[in-house]
């Protein structure tokens, strides 16, 4: 049986990537620091996924095991040395923390003369996730290890999309996911192009698809959450039942459409269908997704290359309208969640400094006119 190592045994790891790997005939070693989940994987070697739709279909994923990378790093290194595929779903900020283990596994592959090509795919909500991981892994490779990696180890970037809401179950492995899923892998950086997974799309140039996903799903989801929170909604579903929230989301996606058409020559009708599907996904009655989950880490989401500021910058550069994206940014600045560290931090920044200074700091913008537009938009909600 083919072997895969997957870093991150959380809901997305089990409920999305794990399912695809299993359906492609892989035995999966999940790597994580969560004792409860790792122990359960090793006791049962299987888990159930529920599809959030009529009938609530169940899928049993088997041939799985767990490795605690904190307690047993050598087992991770050994697994990396022998595996045929590596994937991650741990969050962009955690990628640097697994780089050394991957590097040691690559060194072991070199020492054991395992020249089977290996692809390492970061399935994260970020542009260039695998390339970023490769930069981190290189820091820990010897000169020989680096040369070996350049020959035999690929880090193809990927775009992934499936809504997996925050959830707690008696069974720590059980996970509920939406029916929709999309996983696109860039072929250019692959070292093992013969190993292609069914249910995964392969594209020569991933960038249009990553931006389509990030600017549509991530921007749209976050718009729903921040606008919904401003008008008092507690869940994404509740937010979209409010017509003013739904109109805001549609208007933001309309601006995103103009950008994607101008930049990547997507067809308007194709994007319209894609965006209608996205809204229907957000409205799935079988998924309870709290606004607080989708709206968490507002400072990160206001970043220069993130889901609001980047499309605003690029629309402005092209002389296109970004009125509704700007309004959403104002809702982000007004977002308050005492349980979210960045929300609290943003509130403190706004108390300590001028709004203009905070806008400059969190967005990284240097365009004085655009900074002023954001300030005006935020103040218009006061």
UniProtKB/Swiss-Prot annotation:
Q: Which UniProt keywords apply?
A: NAD, Oxidoreductase
Q: Which GO terms describe its cellular component?
A: cytosol
Q: Which residues form a coiled coil?
A: none
Pfam families per UniProt: Mannitol_dh, Mannitol_dh_C
GO molecular function annotations of the record? mannitol-1-phosphate 5-dehydrogenase activity
Q: Name one GO biological process term.
A: mannitol catabolic process
* Annotated NAD(+) binding sites: 4-15
- Top class in the EC scheme: oxidoreductase
HAMAP family tied to this protein: Mannitol_dehydrog
Family statement drawn from the similarity comment of this UniProt entry: Belongs to the mannitol dehydrogenase family.
Q: What is this protein called in UniProt? A: Mannitol-1-phosphate 5-dehydrogenase
Q: Which organism is it from?
A: Streptococcus mutans serotype c (strain ATCC 700610 / UA159)
């Amino acid at each position: 049986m083919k072997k895969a190592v997957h870093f991150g045994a959380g809901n997305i790891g089990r409920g999305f990537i794990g399912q695809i790997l299993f359906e492609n005939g892989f035995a999966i070693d999940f790597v994580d620091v969560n004792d409860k989940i790792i122990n359960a994987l090793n006791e049962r070697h299987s888990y159930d996924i529920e599809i959030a739709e009529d009938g609530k279909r169940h899928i049993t994923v088997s041939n799985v095991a767990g490795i605690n990378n904190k307690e047993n790093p050598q087992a991770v290194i050994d697994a990396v040395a022998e595996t045929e595929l590596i994937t991650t779903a741990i969050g962009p900020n955690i990628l640097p923390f697994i780089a050394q283990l991957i590097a040691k596994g690559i060194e072991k592959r070199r020492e054991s003369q395992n020249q089977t090509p290996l692809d390492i795919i970061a399935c994260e909500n970020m542009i260039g996730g695998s390339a970023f991981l490769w930069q981190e892994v290189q820091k820990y490779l010897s000169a020989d290890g680096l040369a070996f990696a350049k020959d035999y180890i690929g880090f193809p970037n990927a775009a992934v999309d499936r809504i997996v809401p925050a959830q707690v179950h008696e069974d720590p492995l059980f996970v509920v996911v939406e029916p929709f899923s999309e996983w696109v892998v860039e072929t250019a950086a692959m070292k093992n192009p013969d190993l292609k997974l069914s249910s995964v799309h392969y594209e020569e140039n991933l960038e249009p698809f990553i931006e389509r996903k990030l600017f549509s799903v991530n921007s749209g989801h976050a718009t729903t959450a921040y606008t919904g929170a401003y008008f008092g909604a507690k869940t994404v579903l509740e937010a979209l039942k409010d017509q003013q929230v739904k109109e805001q989301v549609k208007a933001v996606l309309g601006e995103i459409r103009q950008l994607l058409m101008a930049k990547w020559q997507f067809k308007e009708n194709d994007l319209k269908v894609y965006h209608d599907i996205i809204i229907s996904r957000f409205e799935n009655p079988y998924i309870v997704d709290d606004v607080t989950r989708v709206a968490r880490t507002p400072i990160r989401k206001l970043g220069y290359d993130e889901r609001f500021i980047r499309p605003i910058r690029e629309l402005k550069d092209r002389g296109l309208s970004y009125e509704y994206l700007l309004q959403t940014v104002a809702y982000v600045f007004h977002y308050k969640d005492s349980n979210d560290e960045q929300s609290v931090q943003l509130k403190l920044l706004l108390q300590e400094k001028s709004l203009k200074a905070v806008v400059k700091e969190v967005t990284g913008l240097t365009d004085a006119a655009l900074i002023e537009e954001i300030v005006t938009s935020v103040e218009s909600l006061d």
